[in-house]
């Protein structure tokens, strides 16, 4: 739980400028709520795993692919968070949280998994953008509410509708989606490179600065 809360605050600190920009604030908030939130998504992930084989009976194929990508992302995130939590708890409670997180990150390692995690985040953003440009898909999503609820896929339905509306609004401004996704990719990649390659004191200093911006 501490790891998730730290990561949520870190995301807010990394994107305070985007949260102040009315054009991209909804998309930034959507990423925070759905992908970087400290909330427990185990029920939604279990739902996806349980009904993965029946998704195609309710949703169009492109949507099925996105749902499975989301499930893979959250499963990998849980795995990495668990590894970091073990390393976090192994440290004295008096350790400053920024330094504690940096040590946990370096201890957990798995750079390839981290890169894949970010690649899935980007893929979801591009998928949702593509959906908004598919004629009739928004209406189709709306008509699928009851079937989705009946099939136990209400959480997925919510994610898709929220994502569709959020990115649909963003596509109305030329280049806004691409700019938003590029910014997230660049900042998250820069942070990963820092945490994997830099000395501990540099990692702790940057993380503490970022957390300060979230306040």
Question: Over which residues does each language-model region extend?
Answer:
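Extended, well-ordered protein cores
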Residues: 1-214
């Amino acid at each position: 739980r501490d790891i998730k809360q730290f990561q949520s605050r870190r995301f807010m600190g990394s994107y305070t400028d985007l949260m102040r920009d009315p054009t991209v604030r909804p998309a930034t908030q959507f990423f925070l709520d759905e992908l970087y939130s400290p909330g427990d998504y185990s029920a939604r992930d279990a739902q996806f795993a349980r009904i993965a084989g029946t998704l195609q009976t309710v949703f169009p194929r492109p949507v099925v692919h996105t749902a499975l990508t989301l499930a893979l992302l959250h499963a990998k995130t849980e795995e990495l968070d668990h590894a970091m939590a073990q390393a976090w708890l192994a440290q004295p409670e008096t350790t400053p949280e920024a330094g504690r997180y940096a040590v946990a990150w370096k201890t957990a390692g798995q750079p390839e998994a981290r890169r894949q995690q970010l690649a899935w985040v980007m893929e979801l953003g591009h998928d949702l953008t593509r959906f908004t440009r598919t004629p009739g898909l928004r209406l189709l999503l709306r008509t699928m509410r009851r079937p989705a609820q009946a099939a136990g896929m209400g959480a997925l339905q919510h994610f898709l509708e929220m994502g569709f509306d959020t990115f649909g609004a963003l596509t109305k401004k030329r280049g806004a989606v691409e700019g938003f996704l590029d910014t997230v990719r660049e900042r998250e990649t820069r942070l990963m490179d820092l945490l994997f390659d830099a000395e501990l004191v540099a990692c702790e200093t940057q993380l503490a600065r970022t957390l300060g911006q979230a306040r």
